[in-house]
Curated annotation (Swiss-Prot):
It comes from Arabidopsis thaliana (Mouse-ear cress). Residues 433-865 form the FH2 domain. The gene is FH5. This is Formin-like protein 5. SUPFAM superfamilies: Formin homology 2 domain (FH2 domain). Residues 307-316 have a biased composition (Basic and acidic residues). The keyword DNA damage does not apply. Residues 160-173, 369-429 have a biased composition (Pro residues).
Length: 900
């Protein structure tokens, strides 16, 4: 049940609480009624209701014989029947009406005579339980209160006695009889007939005692039920007041703050809280004639003490219980029950002091320390110390919200505006806390990248923080501060300038119109020049025509420009220009034809030059003897290295292999396979170059012995290598057109040729269709027709040349790679270009390596001793042997094998 109440204290939860209380009371009443029903059955077995005679079987029992044979008890019971109901003759009616008196008389008799001592206590407990009169029987009586004098009850209809049935409606909720207001009457003494010889008691008095006993039982039951319900409700209220889970928040403020709320005499009416309590209870006036009981009303003075006790136990909630059924809030801090204990509850309380304004609160600079408490403003009050601010408003209350409580740390509020002139600030120094909190002039931002400080490691910034550098605050404000006055002036000037600008009619998109206006101003092109070019076929800048075609208006914009009948001056510069252009028939088709006329000559020159480069490159690559020598050297070297593997015995290879020669290194880690190939080629190419030089001269003065001597001399060997190295290094210049052809975009070249053919076809169709149908005889038409006639032959020749050159390139690719693909020929030029770059680098390294031993030998010869007169018998080593020892060993092995 606590979980159900904590889910919400609305109207639905109040109804649930009342339902559980009614169910609890009904269960208690049903429990109390079960025993009387059993007593009816037992008594009917003991004595017949119709005749009033004792049952023979029950009479035979020992305890029944002892009690029933006592004539005093029987006579006393019969006497009470006759005195109470002298006019009744029917024993069944006597049994039905005086069932309670009979049981009481028998029980008193048995207890007084002591005839049940030592017997089974089961029957004594049964008879004792017969005395419990349930509250339901009292509520079903016709009268609201008994009469002080005995009166004759109304006669009942004859019929068999019925056990008391349960009422259809539950008993009233929360009925309470405080013991302090109506103390119960003293219980009837059970030993009133202790002595059989004493004077008989009057029947009316004895009946009144029994009725008082019934009333006491009912009052005790009701009070117990009410106390349990109140205790349960108090526990639930405290539990629900501490937590806010599931409760609907009331967004309305607690108070409507105004100037009158700050007065001491103002008050808040709390009468509604008692009224709300009053609605939750029912009034019970059982004894309305005597005025013993009263309803729970907030205006009744008899219940003021109990109400104050309840308020003190519940903590004096500041907010009244609303109609939604919300529980009262906790008492504010500082409010205790003792303060209100001595005051009478008049329905109103004094107002609480308002919360101090936010600008009086001082926020701490340190994030770890809480803000210091700010004393509330002193208010004249004679009732004691000022009360703290009220708690948060309940949900649903209207009115403006009170100022929120201060957080742990928030932004500093702006200071109040000062009316006087601002005093000059001194240079910055060791400022105190007040100077730090003072507002500072906003300066221009300095954009940098902040670095997060790491507390675990010491940084240079830790020492800088404690430095002694100070800057002049006035100077930095004057240099880098925002000039508010100048800015306002500039804003005024800008606003006045904008207001002075005329408002133009915009038809184009703002961005398109702005770009077109900038283009017209940049190229200094007027509308008249453009219109004359479109009518007469004059030449215009290519960039201008291309930009106009890119920024051509959409069909909707073009239609608006043509249908515009207003003043031209109201249009913008871009709209005015396009308005004049679109008035010319087929203006943008004329621009396309004009662009073709202006760009055809340049494009044809580029295409012809590219075709020439490709043709020369193919011829150079096919006819280069040195390039073929390199391919031969690489093929033989590769077959030797791949001997015995599936890669060996190759007859050709793709030219991509040339790019891998520099990646294969020797055992020394420096000599590459490309170095080896170059070393082998430069000697043979040097001898060939020397022979070519000699053949160019006259052989009449040259003898064969001289040639042999020169070939075997050391100087001639060095000369051959130099000549061969220069020859190999000149391969890059020999294949110059190949390197240039590698930069040609084959797709771009083919696209340019196709675009020229398409533009020619489009221009021919425009002249033969649109312009011929319009019947226009202008200079533009004549110029375009003449241009088309001259361009047709050139474009057709370019198309034929493109087919021939592309076939030549493809055949060159097939010449080196076998069956090449579509673009394999142009890719071949790229491979050769990259190989020539690597070859030039290798030749440079070989030249540097050959010059290093010569310099070392000369240095050793200059430092040798002058006493060595005998010639050196050791033959001079070949510089290639000094550079590449692996080559020397290989040659020694070959010579030894030849001698064998």
């Amino acid at each position: 049940m606590v979980g159900m109440i904590r889910g919400g204290m609305g109207d639905q939860n109040w109804s649930r609480l009342v339902f559980w209380l009614i169910l609890f009371s009904g269960l208690l009443v049903i429990t109390l009624e079960e025993n009387p029903e059993k007593d009816e059955i037992f008594l009917s077995q003991f004595m017949a209701p119709s005749t009033g005679q004792v049952n023979e079987h029950m009479e035979e029992t020992s305890w029944a014989q002892r009690c029933w044979q006592d004539s005093d008890c029987v006579k006393e019971a019969v006497a009470e029947f006759n005195l109470c109901f002298p006019g009744s003759k029917d024993s069944r009616e006597l049994f039905g009406l005086n069932h309670t008196n009979l049981k009481q008389t028998l029980l008193d008799c048995i207890q007084e005579k002591g005839k049940l001592n030592g017997h089974n206590p089961k029957y004594l407990e049964l008879l004792s339980s017969m005395l419990d009169i349930p509250r339901r029987n009292l509520a079903t009586k016709p009268g609201s209160s008994p009469s002080p004098s005995p009166s004759r009850p109304p006669k009942r209809s004859r019929g068999p006695p019925r056990p008391p049935t349960r009422p259809k409606s539950p008993p009233p909720r929360k009925s309470s009889f405080p013991p302090s207001r109506s103390p119960p009457p003293p219980p009837a003494k059970k030993n009133a007939s202790k002595n059989s010889t004493s004077a008989p008691v009057s029947p009316a008095k004895k009946k009144e005692d029994h009725e008082k006993t019934i009333i006491i039982a009912v009052v005790v039951t009701a009070v117990s039920t009410f106390l349990l319900a109140a205790l349960f409700f108090l526990c639930c209220s405290r539990v629900c007041g501490n937590g806010s889970g599931g409760r609907k928040n009331d967004e309305r403020p607690l108070l409507s703050l105004s100037s009158s709320d700050y007065s001491v005499g103002s008050s808040i009416n709390y009468g509604g809280s008692v009224k709300g309590d009053k609605q939750g209870h029912q009034s019970f006036n059982i004894y309305s004639n005597q005025g013993k009981m009263s309803s729970f009303d907030g205006s009744n003075s008899d219940t003021s003490d109990s109400l104050e006790e309840r308020l003190s136990h519940e903590g004096l909630r500041n907010n009244s219980i609303t109609n939604h059924g919300l529980p009262p809030l906790k008492p504010p801090p500082g409010r205790t029950a003792s303060v209100l204990s001595g005051k009478s509850f008049s329905g109103k309380v004094e107002p609480l002091p308002p919360e101090p304004p936010k600008f009086l609160k001082v926020s701490s600079k340190k994030a770890s320390a809480p803000p210091p408490p700010v004393p509330a403003p002193q208010m004249p009050s004679s009732a004691g110390p000022p009360r703290p601010p009220p708690p948060a408003p309940p949900p649903g209350s209207g009115g403006p919200k009170p100022p929120p409580p201060p957080g742990p740390k928030g932004p500093r509020p702006p200071p109040p505006m000062s009316l006087g002139p601002k005093a000059p600030r001194p240079p910055s120094g060791p400022a105190d806390a007040l100077d730090d909190d003072a507002p500072k002039t906003k300066l221009k931002p300095f954009f940098w990248d902040k670095v997060q400080a790491n507390p675990e490691h010491s940084m240079v910034w830790n020492d800088i923080r404690s430095g002694s550098f100070q800057f002049n605050e006035e100077m930095i404000e004057s240099l880098f501060g925002y000039a508010a006055a100048d800015k306002n002036k500039n804003d005024k000037k800008g606003s006045s300038g904008q207001a002075a600008l005329p408002q133009f009619v915009q038809i184009l998109e703002p961005k398109k119109g702005q770009n077109l206006s900038i283009l017209l101003r940049a190229l200094n092109a007027t509308t008249e020049e453009v219109c004359d070019a479109l009518r007469e076929g004059n030449e215009l800048p290519v960039e201008f025509i291309q930009t106009l075609l890119k920024m051509a208006p959409t069909p909707e914009e073009e239609l608006k420009l043509r249908l515009y009948c207003g003043e031209i001056a109201q249009l913008g510069s871009a709209e005015r220009f396009l308005k004049a252009v679109v008035d010319i028939p087929f203006a943008f088709k004329r621009l396309e034809a004009l662009l073709f006329m202006c760009t055809l000559h340049e494009e044809m020159a580029f295409v012809k030059e590219s075709f020439q480069k490709l043709e020369v490159a193919c011829k150079e690559l096919r006819g280069s003897r040195l390039f073929l020598k390199l391919l031969e050297a690489v093929l033989k070297t590769g077959n030797r290295m791949n001997d015995g593997t599936f890669r060996g015995g190759a007859q050709a290879f793709k030219l991509d292999t040339l790019l891998k020669l520099a990646d294969v290194k020797g055992t020394d880690g420096k000599t590459t396979l490309l170095h080896f190939v170059v070393q082998e080629i430069i000697r043979t190419e040097g001898v060939r170059a020397a022979r070519t030089i000699r053949e160019s001269q006259s052989f009449s003065s040259v003898k064969t012995e001289d040639l042999l001597v020169e070939e075997t001399s050391e100087e001639s060997e060095e000369n051959y290598r130099n000549l061969g190295l220069e020859k190999v290094s000149g391969l890059s210049s020999e294949l110059e057109h190949v390197k240039k052809s590698a930069n040609i975009d084959a797709d771009g070249l083919t696209g340019t040729v196709l675009k020229m053919g398409h533009a020619l076809s489009k221009a021919r169709d425009f002249v033969n269709s649109e312009m011929k149908s319009s019947g226009e005889e202008s200079g533009f038409r004549e110029a375009l027709e003449d241009f088309i006639q001259n361009a047709e032959g050139s474009i057709m020749s370019i198309l034929e040349e493109e087919k021939r050159i592309m076939a030549l390139v493809k055949s060159t690719g097939d010449y080196f790679h076998g069956k090449a693909g579509k673009d394999e020929g142009l890719r071949l030029f790229v491979i050769v270009r990259d190989f020539l770059i690597i070859l030039d680098k290798s030749c440079k390294e070989v030249r540097e390596a050959r010059g290093r031993p010569v310099r070392m030998a000369r240095k050793q010869g200059s430092t040798a001793s002058a006493s060595s007169e005998t010639p050196r018998q050791t033959p001079s080593l070949d510089p290639r042997q000094k550079l590449f020892p692996a080559i020397t060993e290989r040659r020694v092995d070959q010579s030894s094998s030849d001698s064998d």
